[in-house]
C-alpha cells in the first residue's frame, strides 16, 4: 500500500505561531522525553524486530526486518528477508494521566513500495509494512516511571523480556499500538549522552 505524502510542516518564509502555547509546550516536552530513547518491538525469540526512533518535533523513523533463510527457491537459494524502512510523524499528544499520553500517526511514508520485491545475492527481499505500527488508530506513550501494574497486560506481555525481576516502574519510555496490541520498549539511544548517563545511574542504584 502506498502512503500519501505528508503536508509540509511549515510554510517557507512564514512564522507559524500557535494560539495554544501551553499545549505546544507540553507536546514539545513529551516528544523531548520520548526522544531520549530508542524503541524496539520484538518477541525476544526469532529473527524479527521493528526499531523506532522518535524526534523532538514528533517525527519518527525506523525499520522492520525478518528473515526466513529456510524458505528458498530457484532464484533465491539463500532465503527470504522481509524489510521495511519508514518515517512519519505523530500528532500532538493528548494527556491521559500523569504517565500516559495518547496520539495518532499523522503521516507515514515508506522507502520502498510495500509488497515490492528484489533478489540480491541469492536472497529475496520483500518490502512489507511497518510491523507494530501498521493499522494503528490509537497509540499510547508511557513515560518513564509509569507503574507497570497499571499498564495494559497486552503491552506488558510484549515488554516483559526487557524487565528485571521485581521491577515495578518503567525505567524508560514506551510505545503501545492499542489497535494491534503491539508494545515497544525503550532502550539507550545510540549517541545520546543524556540517556547513557541515565542508564549508568540506574545501574549504580
Q: Where do the PLM segments sit?
A:
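Tryptophan-anchored aromatic micro-motifs
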Residues: 20-51, 61, 176-190, 194, ...
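N-terminal glycine/threonine-rich, aromatic-flanked beta-hairpin/loop signature
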Residues: 46-116
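Sec-dependent signal peptide cleavage junction
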Residues: 1-12
